[in-house]
Curated annotation (Swiss-Prot):
Designated name of the protein: DNA adenine methylase
Chain sites annotated for binding S-adenosyl-L-methionine: 7, 11, 50, 171
Catalytic activity entry: a 2'-deoxyadenosine in DNA + S-adenosyl-L-methionine = an N(6)-methyl-2'-deoxyadenosine in DNA + S-adenosyl-L-homocysteine + H(+)
Organism: Enterobacteria phage T2
Keywords noted in UniProt: DNA replication, DNA-binding, Host-virus interaction, Inhibition of host innate immune response by virus, Methyltransferase, Restriction-modification system evasion by virus, S-adenosyl-L-methionine, Transferase, Viral immunoevasion
Effect of residue 126 to S: In damh; hypermethylating mutant
Enzyme class: transferase
Species lineage: Viruses, Duplodnaviria, Heunggongvirae, Uroviricota, Caudoviricetes
Subunit structure, interactors included: Monomer.
Gene3D superfamilies (alphabetical): Adenine-specific Methyltransferase, Domain 2, Vaccinia Virus protein VP39
GO annotation terms (biological process): DNA replication; DNA restriction-modification system; methylation; mismatch repair; symbiont-mediated evasion of host restriction-modification system; symbiont-mediated suppression of host innate immune response
E.C. code: 2.1.1.72
Function: May prevent degradation of viral DNA by the host restriction-modification antiviral defense system.
Pfam families: MethyltransfD12 (PF02086)
Length: 259
């Protein structure tokens, strides 16, 4: 159940629990595809969408890249767990060229493997004192073996054309959690998404939403009230990693909401 990259909040550990609730479909739409931990591990055809265009362009580039190509870049820049200056040079070169292969190599060496892109399109993740490991090539090969079924797009979720027969899986940024990738998500975006899901339900289109109702003392009252119209499955989950190194194990009510 690997994704293409190590991605904060990925669903690879939860997918076996989610998949029995996925209906039959003509096309699987992964509306916020992130690290592809879902898209790569379901039956195709798949539309994998994410508004983060640099990440989508990276996936498109990887389709025609070999692992040797990745190793050549690492060797060219002399990258290792201790090569901070070399990492900064690679980061500078990516920000000049926007070469998606360089972005892929950067993420192996950045802090917590995060891909952080600012408003100017520049990669800003600091050096992470890390490099490739045995799982890096494993993820790459899993991507190569499963990417043929996927069409990639980088649209805002409201602009994705949903067809009759689609199943729409939705794993958006979470309104009440503090992860870096959630900071641009607002209550207005949340309302727009929930309205979209209501409209899909009205059209007879199946959807599934991953989210949290409660997290470390915070409650998503908007989502909790909305969810009463649909089926709610409460999940048990340990996060793959937490960049804030929180010691708190409990207090998160992660749910799967579906029609």
């Amino acid at each position: 159940m690997l994704g293409a990259i190590a991605y904060t909040g990925n669903k690879q550990s939860l997918l076996p629990e989610l998949k029995p609730h996925f209906p039959k479909y003509d096309r699987f739409v992964d509306l916020f595809c992130g690290g592809l931990s879902v898209s790569l591990n379901v039956n195709g055809p798949v539309l994998a969408n994410d508004i983060q265009e640099p990440i989508i362009e990276m996936y498109k580039r990887l389709i025609n890249v070999s692992w040797d190509d990745v190793l050549k870049v690492i060797k060219q820049y002399k990258l290792s767990k201790t090569s901070k200056e070399e990492f900064l040079k690679l980061r500078e070169d990516y920000n000049k060229t926007r070469d998606p292969l360089l972005l892929y190599v950067l993420h192996f060496h950045g802090f917590s493997n995060m891909i952080r892109i600012n408003d100017k399109g520049n990669f800003t993740t600091p050096f992470g004192k890390r490099t490739i490991n045995k799982n890096s090539e494993k993820r790459f090969n899993h991507f190569k073996q499963n990417c043929d079924k996927i069409i990639f797009s980088s649209l805002h979720f409201k602009d994705v054309k949903i067809l009759d027969g689609d199943f729409v899986y939705v794993d958006p940024p979470y309104l009440i959690t503090v992860a870096d990738y959630n900071k641009f998500w607002s209550e207005e975006e949340e309302k727009d998404l929930l309205n979209l899901l209501d409209s899909l339900n009205d059209r007879g289109i199946k959807f599934g939403l991953s989210n949290v109702l409660e997290h470390h003392g915070k409650e998503n009252t908007l989502l909790k009230e909305w969810s009463k119209k649909y089926n709610v499955k409460h999940l048990n989950k340990k996060y793959v990693f937490n960049i804030y190194h929180s010691k708190e194990k409990n207090g998160t009510d992660e749910v799967y909401i579906f029609n």
